[in-house]
């Protein structure tokens, strides 16, 4: 024998309300999440051209299937050099950018070689352009010998020991 009210209809209504609110929050969650942003050129950028903030704009990524590896912040592209043609409205792949060259092929650079407390300096001509940290081949102007070295941030070449 049971005394009291039959609460099954109240419980059912409460469960229905909870489920309805959970589903409505689940539907709102993607809308509340911030959409990813990407940088796109406002005009065609050709290979070898430096990228300035005026040449790009930030847009919302609406394609969920877009591949990763695109620039999303101006600091990622400002001052970088394009390695390929970048079309307006298309995302800018990070792999399509490189650091600006500190040494230019055919110009005169200072070669520096350290061994112990001794430092040797000479003039050389790089055989290719080089950015900070890249290894380039350089011809010593005085002897004609080819050496390899690392491009330093001051534009000199740190020659490697064999």
Curated annotation (Swiss-Prot):
Cross-referenced CDD domains: SAF_CpaB_FlgA_like (cd11614)
Alphabetic keyword roster: Bacterial flagellum biogenesis, Periplasm, Signal
InterPro entries reported for this sequence: Flag_basal_body_FlgA_C, Flagellar_FlgA, SAF
Pfam families documented for this protein: ChapFlgA (PF13144)
Subcellular localization(s) per the UniProt record: Periplasm
GO cellular component: periplasmic space
Signal peptide (residue range): 1-26
An individual GO BP term: bacterial-type flagellum assembly
UniProt xrefs under SMART domains: SAF
This protein's record includes keyword NADP: no
Similarity annotation: Belongs to the FlgA family.
Listed name of the protein: Flagellar protein FlgA
UniProt organism field: Agrobacterium fabrum (strain C58 / ATCC 33970) (Agrobacterium tumefaciens (strain C58))
